[in-house]
């Protein structure tokens, strides 16, 4: 496992939860909750500033896949958000990780901590980011980093897909990180 701070982002339609881990990558902790700012992207700028201030080696972004594993409208919005982060802080890789059960895990943890449903709103996004990041750290310690990394030159990024057993295959991805098959150049 690579050492270094990772920042996790749980993006919702109204709020964005942030979590970070220690430099050894052992434990995830809540950072704060941001208010979404779709018109001006102040939330994205705050994420970039937080990543730089902490010297993050990676940003983990929750990808809300459908229960069948497909990318529905929520996942497409998250992919667009990932692209904004990549453009805002290009020196830090963004890893897209399946977050299907992170909010459920966050609710369970908050209930176990004795919080009431009314108190959840302020912290549930942070808690979901903690669940997402801790699962990512735990998986990476086994040698199988989950999800895929969005990185590369503007407009044409490579996404590294992890399959069973941790083997990866490279595919071209669009600006939002969505995989596309390679186009063969020079055929004619």
Curated annotation (Swiss-Prot):
Bias type Basic residues, positions: 154-163
Annotated compartments: Cytoplasm
Domain of life: Bacteria
Membrane-spanning parts: none
Gene Ontology BP term (one): rRNA 5'-end processing
Disulphide bond pairs: none
EC number(s) reported in the record: 3.1.-.-
One Pfam family matching this protein: RuvX
Any one Gene Ontology molecular-function term assigned to this protein's record: nuclease activity
GO cellular component: a single term: cytosol
Signal sequence residues: none
InterPro entries in UniProt: RNaseH-like_sf, YqgF, YqgF/RNaseH-like_dom, YqgF/RNaseH-like_dom_sf
Role according to the record: Could be a nuclease involved in processing of the 5'-end of pre-16S rRNA.
Family assignment from sequence similarity: Belongs to the YqgF nuclease family.
Protein name according to UniProt: Putative pre-16S rRNA nuclease
Organism of derivation: Kineococcus radiotolerans (strain ATCC BAA-149 / DSM 14245 / SRS30216)
């Amino acid at each position: 496992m690579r050492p270094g701070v990772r920042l996790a982002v749980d993006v919702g339609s109204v709020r964005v939860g942030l979590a970070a881990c220690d430099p050894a990558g052992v434990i995830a902790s809540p950072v704060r909750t941001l208010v979404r700012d779709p018109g001006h992207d102040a939330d994205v700028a705050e994420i970039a500033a937080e990543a730089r201030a902490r010297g993050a080696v990676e940003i983990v972004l929750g990808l809300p896949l459908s229960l069948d594993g497909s990318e529905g409208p929520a996942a497409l919005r998250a992919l667009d958000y990932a692209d904004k982060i990549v453009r805002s802080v290009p020196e830090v890789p963004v890893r897209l990780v399946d977050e299907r059960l992170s909010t459920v895990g966050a609710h369970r943890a908050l209930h176990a901590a004795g919080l009431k449903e009314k108190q959840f709103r302020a912290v549930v996004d942070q808690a979901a980011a903690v669940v997402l990041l801790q699962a990512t750290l735990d998986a990476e310690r086994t040698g199988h980093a989950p999800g895929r990394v969005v990185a590369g030159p503007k407009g044409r990024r490579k996404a590294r897909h992890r399959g069973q057993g941790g083997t990866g295959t490279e595919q071209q991805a669009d600006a939002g990180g969505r995989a596309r098959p390679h186009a063969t150049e020079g055929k004619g």
